[in-house]
Amino acid sequence: ETLCIYLKRTLDRKFHIRYPNRNEYMHSLFDVISALHNMNDFSILRFDFEDFFNTVSSEYVFNKYISKISLERFQIALFENFVTNTKYAYAGFNTSNILCEIIAKHFDEVLALKFKNHGLIFYRRYIDDGILVFNKRMGADLCISIINEAIQEVFFDKSIAVKYNCKTRLN
């Protein structure tokens, strides 16, 4: 447990992760929703990841993100040993939130870019749940297809060689 706390704090400092605040997100969403009645058309889509923590490969996150930041040799060795032994960001580990937030932050950036020209006016993700609001009618099938593209790009990068791949997908 002490090792997990140390690793989490190290990653918190290096990645400057801002953990989602559910209350803040809800207030922002309600502000947007209250303005929707003035719009001619809009769409709202909610999505969630299936069994999120248990599908994010800790080895993948290490190889794709953590190994690229400046860490001391002993820290790299600790992380390598940890991700080899844990395989996934299992719910309950102190490191699970940070590992998932590192990759999910990248997912958020990719998703926002993919929806940039589709009238996206609001997007927030709280851990494994996301909500998108558009200023025009957007079909659910198109939205889900674009979300799946972002998932493939972020969680299934073929250039990252790992023993345990991410299994992340929509519910």
Residue ranges and their predicted role:
Residues 2-46, 51-54:
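Active-site-proximal segment of RNA-dependent polymerases
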Residues 10-18, 69, 73, 154-158:
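A generic secondary-structure signal for well-formed alpha-helical elements
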Residues 34-127, 131-146, 150-152, 164-170:
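Conserved polymerase palm-domain catalytic core
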Residues 157-165:
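Acidic/polar loop patches that form or flank catalytic/metal-binding clefts of enzymes
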